[in-house]
Amino acid sequence: MIKQLILKDFIIQWKFLIWYILYPIFFYMALTDTENLFIIMSVIITIGAIVKTFEADSKNESEVIVNSLPILRKQIVYAKYIVAIIILFISVIVGCFTMGMKNGVNLFEFIETTMVASISFILIYLSLVLPISFWLAYKKAIFITLFMLIAPTAICTMFFEINLEQIQLYNSLLFVSSICMFIVSAFVSMKLYEKREF
């Protein structure tokens, strides 16, 4: 049954496939900084796709329909987390392909530094956003999701100088911590979703 739930979310994504192709092309032409290009692409594709699955569930009332079927709520949560991981890997592959097209980019060094840091930050963000999305209805969750994406970025840009090189020194710790946080987040989402009423 989890496979069918995953398939459902990916069928929804086909409608937006053209945008996922156009975004990297647009940023490839607009940005010269390869680190920023990769980070922006991976964040937009991953977060955008996940938000769209929740939006489609809310719009089509598919959550209500799915919950009326003999499916455990934890299976619904697991399916959404698996979809998030698959989309993250797809966005990383697209990002690496785009980076490979850039002249003068050391792809192996790029993977060890920027890519690992980017994946870690996306996993941390998903660890916060997914439980909120399972806990609240889509309309409430989307505002919190956007705030959580925009506010920290704006605050760090305005008041702090973000140094990717310093962040990259702690890549291994950050990556392991983000994976642990993502796993804990899945259990939290499960508990919140089981208590939610439809």
Language-model segment annotations:
Residues S68-R73:
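Short helix-to-coil transition segments within interhelical loops
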